[in-house]
């Protein structure tokens, strides 16, 4: 319940994921969590978070990528964590790629709509991700990061 929120350890909210291609530098929300929860729901550099439920289909599957470790932090239950098990994924590249219309279109094909849009775990596992060689991923991410910096400043 609500009594667990407001104090404790950093907490990744649904809106943190929904509104940011990359996790914010600081997670402002706090929640009381156990050692076990902090271990099983940890946030490490390279982790990809995807919103798995939403009010509408077009808001489903929004992603955000952790560019650093967040010690003692946990994430919300309406978000799915994907932890790449390969060194073939450059976090900045995947952060941009997962927000492209081409990739996001796959969510529409897999999602189901009852009263809320939702994604099943198996659907996420069946989605295709284009991974060019690491050097190309770095170049793409660097170019897009520079544009982001120009837009923000």
Predicted regions and their residues:
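A generic secondary-structure signal for well-formed alpha-helical elements
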Residues: 53, 101-102, 147-152
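Specificity-determining recognition surfaces
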Residues: 97-129
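Amphipathic alpha-helical segments
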Residues: 90, 94, 123-153
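Short proline/glycine-enriched turn/loop segments at secondary-structure junctions
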Residues: 2, 69-70, 115-119
